Regions:
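Hydrophobic pocket/interface hotspot
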Residues: 17-21, 27, 53, 70, ...
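A conserved amphipathic terminal alpha-helix motif
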Residues: 114-149
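A structural signal for short, well-ordered beta-strand segments
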Residues: 6-8, 53-55, 108-110
Length: 149
């Protein structure tokens, strides 16, 4: 149902930004509406880093946890995320990192549908705004952590 994307040019090293996105256990420190996170499994399989992680997302009376399958392709500089369970009918996230001089162009695409049709309608109306807030949070975190790199 909702599908959106954002693209940002961030004045940080590509590898540091990838490390930031893969640090799922740190998300509650800076991602809006992320209340908790946990990495259950992390395996380096050569060209692929594979993780299984939970995120608890909430605002107001709404709160839910979903489990994700996260795969980082080192050769392509792409992170793909799919849901395994939780309130989502499906979730497909795609992060792409491209070096641009001393900066990195980060593309973040999200496509998802909630199992609850009412919540799905509510989310559709504010989805791009929420995605922009998440992208802002990653950019601000990168600027804070890697300012002098």
């Amino acid at each position: 149902m909702p599908k959106a994307s954002v693209k940002r040019l961030i004045g940080s090293d590509k590898d540091k930004l990838i490390e930031l996105v893969l640090a799922v256990d740190k998300y509650p420190e800076f991602i809006p509406y992320c209340l908790n996170s946990k990495i259950y499994e992390k395996k380096d399989q050569g060209d692929i880093i594979h993780m299984i992680a939970d995120l608890t997302i909430g605002k107001g009376i709404f709160k839910d946890t979903y489990k994700s399958d996260v795969n980082y392709n080192k050769k392509k500089n792409i992170i793909l995320v799919k849901n395994l369970d939780g309130p989502l009918k499906y979730l497909n996230n795609r992060w792409v990192f491209v070096e641009k001089g001393k900066s990195t162009e980060v593309s973040f695409e999200v496509d998802f549908e909630l199992k609850n049709k009412f919540l799905n309608i509510l989310m559709t109306k504010s989805f791009q705004y929420g995605l922009d807030k998440i992208a802002d949070a990653f950019q601000k975190r990168a600027e804070k952590l890697y300012k002098n790199i």
